[in-house]
């Protein structure tokens, strides 16, 4: 089956055909590092991590660029407010501190590092070059009030609105700059002239005067700098579709770049049925989320909904994810113990880097616009079938299903047995539990051999009360947690 992705520009499912055979270039709008990361940031980054992993599984060489917006009105304003409250942190220090918070949160969730992670402040020259081309082509104009602002002339670009299918007359005024010298209220800032009272370190020299770039031009410059004038996929949150992505597309095309061939947008997060927002006071910060559950559980939850749908967070959401992941983990543990020492023992992972094959139904789901919910259904069906095979003593079938489950969780990045999810505290606890349970099982076996069935039954009952299930078979006794 051919991979199909929902292209926001055409509002349709399209067969994915890379610009260069065997290679994929992806640009994802990263965070504006003004304040601590929240669940919405994590959900977006994880959606494109799933896409990247699936493309890599299909044998494509993926270059993923995720930017850091480290210069912006919000960054400057937050630093100023901190200083007014008695702090000393400069805007650039705030941006770097918050950037590290994002990096730690991404790493905790197993989100693969991007191929490139450029900061906006490192591409000022590329931004000015695009602005210069737009001015030369008649699609941008310097303000005539001496402010140093440069605006994109929306009236000069008839295709403006093509991404969101809006008519120019229906669009709202651009809210990213003062309207002091705009020709049209929809025109947006490409370059913002320095204002009195702003830190000198937040301005760069330019042909139009000292200032800093507008938000939209930053992504146009960084994407084409690292991926070229035309690249495969541009991704980001649904809330960026307008005006940010609409403006990116317009200014890039007007400057002569073909730009992105596919546009993907992930859905937002709702908390107790309400859209998450600072104004409602219902933001869920990454640090709190990661403190409330194991990171792999958080990753499972964030990636369990279709990437284009709204992700609903409620009080029991993480508990449900924990239960689902526990079913996977206990099957993998149980099957590993049952198969150990048999001819069906799990083989070590291939050393040539080739991923293990996933079931056809799983691949079909992922090829259908990354239908992760359907892929997870295939995964859990395999877990149930694997447990049934173990119950029936069919080790060959159990081994086959274990291989399927292992391949699927590896592709999704949620293998609960992977070293990356084993914390320093997990390892000793697991070893201690295993030693204690196996010691009691050995005592039970000794009692059975001595025909002391009362003691053997008492040991079984004690373990059952602790959530340990014992299964007796001709090959010996095996144990599992919580009714594996």
UniProtKB/Swiss-Prot annotation:
Cross-referenced CDD domains: CysRS_core
Keyword Ribosomal protein: no
UniProt feature coiled coil, ranges: none
GO terms for biological process, alphabetical: cysteinyl-tRNA aminoacylation
Pfam families on file: CysS_C (PF23493), DALR_2 (PF09190), tRNA-synt_1e (PF01406)
Binding positions for ATP per the UniProt entry: 278
EC number: 6.1.1.16
Cofactor binding: number and manner: Binds 1 zinc ion per subunit.
Gene3D superfamilies cross-referenced by the UniProt entry: Cysteine-tRNA ligase, C-terminal anti-codon recognition domain (1.20.120.1910), HUPs (3.40.50.620)
Recorded GO CC terms: cytosol
Keyword annotations from UniProtKB, A to Z: Aminoacyl-tRNA synthetase, ATP-binding, Cytoplasm, Ligase, Metal-binding, Nucleotide-binding, Protein biosynthesis, Zinc
Quaternary structure and interacting proteins, as annotated: Monomer.
Protein's UniProt name: Cysteine--tRNA ligase
Protein source organism: Clavibacter sepedonicus
Name of the gene encoding the protein in the UniProt record: cysS
């Amino acid at each position: 089956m051919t991979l199909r992705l929902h292209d926001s520009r055409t509002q349709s499912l399209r067969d994915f055909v890379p610009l260069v055979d065997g290679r994929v270039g992806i640009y994802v709008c990263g965070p504006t590092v003004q304040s601590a990361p929240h669940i919405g940031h994590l959900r977006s980054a994880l959606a494109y991590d799933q896409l990247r992993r699936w493309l890599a599984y299909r044998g494509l060489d993926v270059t993923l660029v995720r930017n850091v917006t480290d210069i912006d009105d919000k960054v400057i304003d937050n630093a100023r407010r901190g200083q007014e409250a008695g702090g000393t942190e400069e805007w650039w220090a705030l941006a770097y501190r918050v950037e590290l918070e994002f990096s730690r949160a991404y790493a905790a969730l197993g989100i693969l590092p991007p191929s490139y992670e450029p900061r906006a402040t490192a591409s000022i020259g590329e931004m000015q070059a695009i602005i210069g081309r737009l001015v030369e082509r008649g699609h941008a104009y310097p303000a005539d009030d001496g402010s140093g602002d440069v605006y994109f002339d929306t009236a000069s670009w008839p295709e403006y609105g093509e991404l969101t299918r809006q008519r120019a007359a229906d669009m709202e005024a651009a809210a990213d700059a003062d309207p002091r010298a705009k020709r049209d209220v929809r025109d947006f800032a490409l370059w913002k002239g320095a204002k009195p009272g702003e830190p000198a370190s937040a301005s760069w020299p330019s042909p139009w005067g000292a200032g800093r770039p507008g938000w939209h031009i930053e992504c146009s410059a960084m994407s084409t700098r690292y991926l070229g004038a035309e690249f495969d996929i541009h991704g980001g949150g649904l809330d960026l579709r307008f005006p940010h992505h609409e403006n990116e597309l317009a200014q890039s095309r007007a400057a002569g770049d073909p730009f992105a061939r596919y546009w993907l947008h992930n859905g937002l997060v709702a908390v107790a049925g309400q859209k998450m927002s600072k104004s409602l006071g219902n933001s869920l910060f990454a640090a709190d989320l990661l403190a409330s559950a194991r990171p792999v559980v958080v990753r499972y939850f964030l990636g369990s909904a279709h990437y284009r749908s709204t992700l609903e967070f409620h009080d029991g959401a993480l508990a449900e994810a924990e239960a689902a992941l526990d079913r996977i983990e206990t099957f993998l543990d149980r099957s590993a113990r049952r198969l150990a020492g048999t001819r069906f023992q799990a083989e070590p992972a291939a050393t040539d880097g080739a991923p293990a094959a996933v079931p056809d139904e799983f691949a079909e789901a992922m090829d259908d616009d990354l239908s992760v919910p359907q892929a997870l259904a295939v995964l859990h069906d395999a877990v149930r079938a694997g447990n049934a095979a173990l119950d029936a003593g069919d080790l060959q079938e159990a081994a086959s299903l274990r291989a399927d489950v292992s391949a699927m969780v590896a592709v999704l990045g949620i293998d609960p047995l992977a070293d990356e999810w084993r914390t320093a505290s997990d390892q000793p606890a697991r070893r201690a539990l295993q030693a204690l349970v196996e010691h009691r099982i050995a005592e039970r076996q000794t009692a059975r051999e001595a025909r002391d069935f009362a003691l053997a039954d008492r040991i079984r009952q004690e373990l059952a009360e602790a959530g340990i299930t014992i299964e007796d078979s001709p090959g010996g006794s095996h144990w599992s947690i919580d009714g594996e």
